[in-house]
Amino acid sequence: MNLQEIKNIATSEELIDRALRRASKVEEKVRNPDYRARLTAVRKIHSVADNLANPMISYVKAFPSFDSIHPFDREIIDLTVGVDMLKKSLGAIDWARKEILMISTKYVPRARARQSAETTMKIMSEAYTKMTNVVRQISKSFDFLISARSIFRNLPNVDTDSPIA
């Protein structure tokens, strides 16, 4: 296991900004304005959810599984950042990912429903707000993972598989 190879982790605000910026570029080219609004809203909700959830799962997978790592590595993690705090932060990020996907699946059918463009945009805005609030709720977990990553990058790389002769 190499703790130095953990990829860069974005802050919660950077993640939100990136997701909303990418979603703003999504548009449908349909003549009927109500239908266009529904299609665009659905695609934008999916875009925001994907651009928030996909980096989160990669952050969780970037850190080692504590059940399968060498006891020495586990002790190093525990002494530097604390295994319990790291597990808590990773768990919070995984919870937020699941919550965002659940919000997306809840709001997409509502955005698809036959209604005016104005109502559809309100539903889309509500979905955006809920998803970004979930990410902001766990901003301290992102900050902790960023600091843990910087601490891990400064640690020496010790090969625990080869014998010390």
Stretch-by-stretch model annotation:
Residues 147-160:
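Pre-Walker A adenine-sensing motif
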Residues 90-149:
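Charged, amphipathic alpha-helical linker segments immediately N-terminal to NTP-binding catalytic cores
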Residues 1-96:
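N-terminal accessory targeting/assembly segments
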Residues 162-165:
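Glycine-rich phosphate-binding P-loop
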Residues 11, 113-119, 157-159:
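Intrinsic-disorder/low-complexity, polar/charged segments
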